[in-house]
Amino acid sequence: EISACLVGSEMCIRDSLIRKNPFGFELVNVIVNDSVRREAVTRKQEREFLRFIKEDAHFCKYYDAIFILFNTGLRISEFCGLTKSDLDFKNKRIRVNHQLQRTSQMQYIIEKPKTESGERYVPMSDEVMACFKRILKDRVNPKVEPMVDGMTGFLFLDKNDMPMVALHWEKYFQHIREKYNSIYKVQMPPITPHVCRHTFCSNMAKSGMNPKMLQYIMGHSDISV
Protein backbone atom coordinates (compact mmCIF):
# COMPACT_ATOMS: atom_id res chain seq x y z
CA GLU A 1 0.00 0.00 0.00
CA ILE A 2 2.78 2.41 0.93
CA SER A 3 4.79 1.53 -2.17
CA ALA A 4 1.72 2.10 -4.35
CA CYS A 5 1.35 5.60 -2.88
CA LEU A 6 5.01 6.30 -3.58
CA VAL A 7 4.79 5.14 -7.19
CA GLY A 8 1.51 6.96 -7.80
CA SER A 9 2.89 10.21 -6.41
CA GLU A 10 6.04 9.95 -8.50
CA MET A 11 3.86 9.60 -11.62
CA CYS A 12 1.93 12.75 -10.65
CA ILE A 13 5.19 14.66 -10.25
CA ARG A 14 6.37 13.46 -13.65
CA ASP A 15 3.09 14.62 -15.21
CA SER A 16 3.37 18.00 -13.38
CA LEU A 17 0.18 17.37 -11.41
CA ILE A 18 1.91 17.94 -8.08
CA ARG A 19 5.24 19.56 -7.15
CA LYS A 20 6.43 17.28 -4.35
CA ASN A 21 5.90 13.65 -3.41
CA PRO A 22 3.92 13.72 -0.13
CA PHE A 23 5.11 10.19 0.61
CA GLY A 24 8.80 10.90 0.06
CA PHE A 25 9.78 10.81 3.72
CA GLU A 26 11.94 8.62 5.94
CA LEU A 27 9.75 5.85 7.31
CA VAL A 28 12.05 5.62 10.32
CA ASN A 29 10.68 8.97 11.46
CA VAL A 30 7.13 7.68 11.20
CA ILE A 31 7.65 4.45 13.10
CA VAL A 32 9.73 5.73 15.96
CA ASN A 33 7.74 8.61 17.36
CA ASP A 34 8.97 11.04 19.98
CA SER A 35 7.78 8.98 22.94
CA VAL A 36 9.64 5.92 21.67
CA ARG A 37 12.86 7.87 21.15
CA ARG A 38 12.52 9.43 24.57
CA GLU A 39 12.06 6.12 26.39
CA ALA A 40 14.47 3.95 24.42
CA VAL A 41 18.04 3.56 25.64
CA THR A 42 21.03 3.62 23.31
CA ARG A 43 22.66 0.45 22.01
CA LYS A 44 25.66 1.23 24.20
CA GLN A 45 23.49 1.54 27.31
CA GLU A 46 21.68 -1.68 26.40
CA ARG A 47 24.97 -3.57 26.03
CA GLU A 48 26.32 -2.13 29.28
CA PHE A 49 23.13 -2.99 31.18
CA LEU A 50 23.17 -6.57 29.88
CA ARG A 51 26.89 -6.93 30.59
CA PHE A 52 26.37 -5.85 34.18
CA ILE A 53 23.53 -8.34 34.66
CA LYS A 54 25.48 -11.20 33.10
CA GLU A 55 28.53 -10.59 35.30
CA ASP A 56 26.67 -9.96 38.56
CA ALA A 57 26.64 -12.95 40.91
CA HIS A 58 23.04 -12.36 41.99
CA PHE A 59 21.31 -10.79 39.00
CA CYS A 60 22.85 -13.09 36.36
CA LYS A 61 19.88 -15.45 36.75
CA TYR A 62 17.73 -12.79 35.05
CA TYR A 63 20.07 -12.26 32.10
CA ASP A 64 18.34 -14.56 29.61
CA ALA A 65 14.89 -13.12 30.29
CA ILE A 66 16.03 -9.52 30.03
CA PHE A 67 17.99 -10.26 26.85
CA ILE A 68 14.78 -11.69 25.38
CA LEU A 69 12.81 -8.57 26.32
CA PHE A 70 15.39 -6.34 24.63
CA ASN A 71 15.39 -8.50 21.49
CA THR A 72 11.75 -9.39 20.89
CA GLY A 73 9.76 -6.29 21.82
CA LEU A 74 7.26 -8.36 23.78
CA ARG A 75 4.96 -6.61 26.23
CA ILE A 76 5.85 -7.73 29.75
CA SER A 77 2.38 -9.22 30.31
CA GLU A 78 2.79 -11.21 27.08
CA PHE A 79 6.23 -12.37 28.20
CA CYS A 80 4.91 -13.46 31.62
CA GLY A 81 2.13 -15.39 29.92
CA LEU A 82 4.45 -17.44 27.72
CA THR A 83 4.22 -21.21 28.14
CA LYS A 84 6.37 -24.01 26.79
CA SER A 85 3.88 -24.60 23.97
CA ASP A 86 4.30 -21.02 22.73
CA LEU A 87 7.94 -21.60 21.77
CA ASP A 88 8.40 -22.94 18.24
CA PHE A 89 12.10 -23.72 17.95
CA LYS A 90 11.68 -25.48 14.61
CA ASN A 91 10.33 -22.36 12.91
CA LYS A 92 12.23 -19.98 15.24
CA ARG A 93 9.20 -18.03 16.37
CA ILE A 94 7.16 -17.18 19.47
CA ARG A 95 3.38 -17.48 19.43
CA VAL A 96 1.73 -14.55 21.19
CA ASN A 97 -1.99 -15.07 21.67
CA HIS A 98 -2.54 -14.15 25.32
CA GLN A 99 -1.18 -12.16 28.24
CA LEU A 100 -1.01 -12.88 31.96
CA GLN A 101 -2.37 -10.38 34.47
CA ARG A 102 -2.79 -10.36 38.25
CA THR A 103 -5.64 -8.28 39.61
CA SER A 104 -5.60 -6.10 42.73
CA GLN A 105 -7.39 -9.00 44.44
CA MET A 106 -4.34 -11.18 43.62
CA GLN A 107 -6.31 -13.19 41.07
CA TYR A 108 -4.39 -14.51 38.07
CA ILE A 109 -6.18 -14.14 34.75
CA ILE A 110 -5.45 -14.73 31.07
CA GLU A 111 -6.46 -12.00 28.66
CA LYS A 112 -6.19 -11.57 24.91
CA PRO A 113 -3.24 -9.46 23.75
CA LYS A 114 -3.78 -5.90 22.59
CA THR A 115 -3.10 -6.98 19.00
CA GLU A 116 -6.25 -6.56 16.89
CA SER A 117 -5.99 -10.03 15.35
CA GLY A 118 -5.57 -11.57 18.79
CA GLU A 119 -2.52 -13.55 17.70
CA ARG A 120 0.87 -12.89 16.15
CA TYR A 121 4.21 -14.65 15.75
CA VAL A 122 7.42 -12.96 16.85
CA PRO A 123 10.66 -14.22 15.26
CA MET A 124 13.46 -15.63 17.41
CA SER A 125 17.09 -14.86 16.67
CA ASP A 126 19.62 -17.60 17.40
CA GLU A 127 20.61 -15.74 20.58
CA VAL A 128 17.01 -15.45 21.76
CA MET A 129 16.41 -19.12 21.04
CA ALA A 130 19.50 -20.05 23.07
CA CYS A 131 18.16 -17.95 25.97
CA PHE A 132 14.81 -19.73 25.89
CA LYS A 133 16.49 -23.13 25.82
CA ARG A 134 18.59 -22.25 28.87
CA ILE A 135 15.46 -21.01 30.65
CA LEU A 136 13.68 -24.30 29.98
CA LYS A 137 16.73 -26.30 31.06
CA ASP A 138 17.08 -24.38 34.34
CA ARG A 139 13.35 -24.33 35.12
CA VAL A 140 12.55 -26.23 38.31
CA ASN A 141 9.37 -28.20 37.82
CA PRO A 142 6.95 -27.66 40.74
CA LYS A 143 5.13 -30.49 42.45
CA VAL A 144 1.93 -29.15 40.95
CA GLU A 145 2.00 -27.05 37.80
CA PRO A 146 0.00 -23.85 38.30
CA MET A 147 -2.99 -23.47 36.00
CA VAL A 148 -4.51 -20.14 35.00
CA ASP A 149 -7.70 -20.24 32.95
CA GLY A 150 -6.74 -23.67 31.64
CA MET A 151 -3.14 -22.77 30.76
CA THR A 152 -0.08 -24.44 32.28
CA GLY A 153 3.66 -24.59 31.64
CA PHE A 154 4.50 -20.96 32.41
CA LEU A 155 8.23 -20.31 31.99
CA PHE A 156 8.83 -18.34 35.19
CA LEU A 157 7.47 -19.22 38.62
CA ASP A 158 7.86 -17.35 41.89
CA LYS A 159 8.78 -18.80 45.30
CA ASN A 160 5.15 -19.89 45.75
CA ASP A 161 5.21 -21.78 42.44
CA MET A 162 2.87 -19.28 40.83
CA PRO A 163 3.60 -17.56 37.50
CA MET A 164 5.68 -14.40 37.74
CA VAL A 165 3.83 -11.24 36.71
CA ALA A 166 4.85 -7.79 35.49
CA LEU A 167 5.43 -6.47 39.02
CA HIS A 168 8.13 -9.08 39.65
CA TRP A 169 10.13 -7.99 36.63
CA GLU A 170 9.65 -4.29 37.26
CA LYS A 171 11.17 -4.78 40.72
CA TYR A 172 14.09 -6.80 39.32
CA PHE A 173 14.85 -4.04 36.83
CA GLN A 174 14.66 -1.44 39.59
CA HIS A 175 17.07 -3.35 41.86
CA ILE A 176 19.53 -3.97 39.03
CA ARG A 177 19.65 -0.30 38.10
CA GLU A 178 20.01 0.78 41.73
CA LYS A 179 23.00 -1.51 42.21
CA TYR A 180 24.56 -0.41 38.92
CA ASN A 181 24.21 3.27 39.81
CA SER A 182 25.68 2.67 43.27
CA ILE A 183 28.86 1.35 41.61
CA TYR A 184 29.40 3.45 38.48
CA LYS A 185 29.81 7.20 38.16
CA VAL A 186 28.04 7.33 34.79
CA GLN A 187 24.47 6.63 35.82
CA MET A 188 22.15 4.26 33.98
CA PRO A 189 18.84 5.91 33.01
CA PRO A 190 15.55 4.33 34.07
CA ILE A 191 15.17 0.95 32.37
CA THR A 192 11.96 -1.04 32.66
CA PRO A 193 10.41 -3.88 30.64
CA HIS A 194 8.51 -1.19 28.72
CA VAL A 195 11.77 0.59 27.91
CA CYS A 196 13.09 -2.72 26.54
CA ARG A 197 10.11 -2.85 24.19
CA HIS A 198 10.64 0.74 23.03
CA THR A 199 14.35 0.09 22.57
CA PHE A 200 13.70 -2.96 20.39
CA CYS A 201 11.25 -0.96 18.26
CA SER A 202 13.72 1.90 17.90
CA ASN A 203 16.60 -0.42 17.01
CA MET A 204 14.59 -2.30 14.39
CA ALA A 205 13.32 0.91 12.78
CA LYS A 206 16.83 2.35 12.61
CA SER A 207 18.12 -0.88 11.08
CA GLY A 208 15.66 -0.46 8.20
CA MET A 209 13.11 -3.16 9.02
CA ASN A 210 10.02 -3.07 6.80
CA PRO A 211 7.44 -0.82 8.52
CA LYS A 212 4.55 -3.25 8.16
CA MET A 213 6.67 -6.11 9.49
CA LEU A 214 7.71 -4.05 12.52
CA GLN A 215 4.10 -3.03 13.10
CA TYR A 216 3.12 -6.72 13.05
CA ILE A 217 5.92 -7.84 15.40
CA MET A 218 5.13 -5.09 17.89
CA GLY A 219 1.41 -5.84 17.76
CA HIS A 220 0.60 -2.22 16.93
CA SER A 221 -2.66 -1.28 15.25
CA ASP A 222 -1.01 1.74 13.61
CA ILE A 223 2.45 2.26 12.11
CA SER A 224 2.92 5.54 13.96
CA VAL A 225 2.35 4.03 17.42
Locate predicted features.
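Short, basic (Lys/Arg/His-rich) helix/loop patches that form interaction surfaces
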Residues: 51-62, 122, 138-147, 151-154, ...
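Conserved tyrosine-mediated DNA breakage-rejoining catalytic core shared by Y-recombinases
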Residues: 27-30, 45, 82-140, 147
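Basic, Lys/Arg- and aromatic-enriched nucleic-acid-binding interface segment
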Residues: 18-76, 80-82, 90, 117-119, ...
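Single conserved hydrophobic/aromatic residue that forms the stacking wall/gate
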Residues: 1-8, 13
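Catalytic-site neighborhood detector that most strongly recognizes the C-terminal catalytic loop/helix
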Residues: 32, 40, 99-100, 218-225
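A short, basic/aromatic helix-end/turn motif that makes direct DNA contacts
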Residues: 81-87, 215-221
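Detector for glycine-centered tight turns/loop "hinges" at secondary-structure junctions
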Residues: 16, 105-107, 161
